[in-house]
Amino acid sequence: MAGKPGIQLFVIFLLLSSFAAVVWAMDNMPADKDVSKLFPLTLIHINDLHARFDETNMKSNACTAKDQCIAGIARVYQKIQDLLKEYKSKNAIYLNAGDNFQGTLWYNLLRWQVTADFITKLKPTAMTLGNHEFDHTPKGLAPYLAELDKAGIPTLVANLVMNDDPDLKSSKIQKSIKVTVGGKTIGIIGVLYDKTHEIAQTGKVTLSNAVETVKREAAALKKDKVDIIVVLSHCSYDEDKKIAKEAGQDIDVIVGAHSHSFLYSKESNKPYDQKDKIEGPYPTIVESNNKRKIPIVQAKSFGKYVGRLTLYFDNEGEVKHWEGYPEFIDNKVKQDPKILEALIPWRKKVQEIGSTKVGETTIELDRDSCRDKECTLGVLYADAFADHYTNSSFRPFAIIQAGNFRNPIKVGKITNGDIIEAAPFGSTADLIRLKGDNLWAVAEHSLALDDENRTNCLQVSGLRIVIDPSKSVGSRVVKIDVMDNRNPKSEDLKPLDRNAEYFIALPSYLADGKDGFSAMKEATARWTGPLDSDVFKSYVEKIKKVDKLKLDRVIVCKAGSPCT
């Protein structure tokens, strides 16, 4: 850019303007600490619990005897009760921002039942849904919603469009609620990431634009004489900043989720895990288009922190001061004895089912590298899918998106728990017939960055993909070679015929065109198979031991090297 000051200034202007709305904040209290003439509202909040019912280690994985155990639902419950009591005089309410489903064997085996048991014990003032609440379709969500309703817990998603979904037609999801605390009426609006229907198994359900929905619902609440409006969002830190900027004329604060963002102000000098990356201050203050200051909070994930923010409002309903921080749920936090007792029967079920041996492996089945390149877990999983449909005269390819995987499998015995936790989303192992040109488009899309700046590298069986990441978007797939679907005895590879049709085994999630894999919708035929975990389990039982895998199925060319 040397010699082009005009361009430099323009780029600097763009950078500054993109951050101008965000104020990096810490506690904002008057020097004399006198807030006696202001109305206090305290928000106690958690998000993205992801089935961490049992205590965890510092990395939010299962805690072992060697670890320092933290978090867990018994500690979270105790901390919430303590905060509700401590801040009762400051009008405390407790909010849950969604994604309580998915993430451990507890959910994989016990689904909505165990989740409902503990969420109803915590009993938030209100909660919204996360995208993972749809992991087992609306049918898997409906009984959970019914239990929340029985417990008197309102579920709020203002931008949820039912589209006559048969499983949710009797659910009592609301756009917003009004609660009265300290003589003031508080409106709470729930909102879910508006592309959830593209990344989750939502059935007929879709999501409307989050910003426009919040604007509309907030205006209606203001017209109804609500004093303060809280947005309970499962949209991500970045999306929440957008909501604050563009819909900030009527809302007062956003309690967020989805991005697992750790917001913290070091000036608070409060304890935290110093290995947790700080993404912004707690609270983050965004200036709206009409110059109002909108605080945003989020409490990372996995029950590792419980957020507590106290806001002070003037008579005009404007936030004048605030203070608070995420409370670290370390091992100094006591565990509630009643919750500990309630965990015992559930834990017994998890241990009994999860510890059964299925097979063994002499190599680590890696998950961490799956997003960027071929990984051993992905290769084994793809082989299992292909094997399920293979017979003496037929063998399909198999492709699995990297986002399908959640946990690696370590060297040693492979258990039921390992099988389920490796890919816990409950997809079916389907078979489709797809044109070669569409398969090429799918391979190209796997290299595109998602909203978290990640690729979704395909894990494959029966084909070989060569990728040149130095090329432009849309031209990164150099070649695809494939085996013959009709000759399972031959492992010879031939160039993909982009006009021919091929048979491909894949997860139903991918076959549905989720995660932007829209070319999958061009399939000319589709057959629904059994649960993916059952297919994976059967394959591991069949081969008994994983001791070697044929790799180099996805070749990522290195800079300066031939790409063939």
Swiss-Prot record:
A GO MF label: metal ion binding
Pfam families attached to this UniProt entry: 5_nucleotid_C, Metallophos
Site feature (Transition state stabilizer) residues: 132, 135
Tissue occurrence: Female salivary gland (at protein level). Low-level expression in male tissues. Not detected in female carcasses without salivary glands.
Binding site for AMP: 371, 406, 425, 515
Main location: secreted
Sites where a glycan is attached: 391
Catalysed reaction equations from the record: a ribonucleoside 5'-triphosphate + 2 H2O = a ribonucleoside 5'-phosphate + 2 phosphate + 2 H(+)
GO BP term, example: AMP catabolic process
Amino acids binding a divalent metal cation 1: 48, 50, 99
Disulfide bridge positions per record: none
Subcellular location: Secreted
Top-level taxonomic group: Eukaryota
Cellular component annotations (GO), alphabetically ordered: extracellular region; plasma membrane
Cofactor requirement: a divalent metal cation
E.C. code: 3.6.1.5
Family: Belongs to the 5'-nucleotidase family.
Additional observations: Platelet aggregation is inhibited by 6% when 0.4 uM recombinant apyrase is added and by 9.5% when the concentration of recombinant apyrase is 0.8 uM. Antibodies against the protein are found in the serum of individuals exposed to Aedes albopictus bites.
Function: Facilitates hematophagy by inhibiting ADP-dependent platelet aggregation in the host. Cleaves adenosine triphosphate (ATP) and adenosine diphosphate (ADP) to adenosine monophosphate (AMP) and inorganic phosphate. May reduce probing time by facilitating the speed of locating blood.
Protein name per Swiss-Prot or TrEMBL: Apyrase
Organism: Aedes albopictus
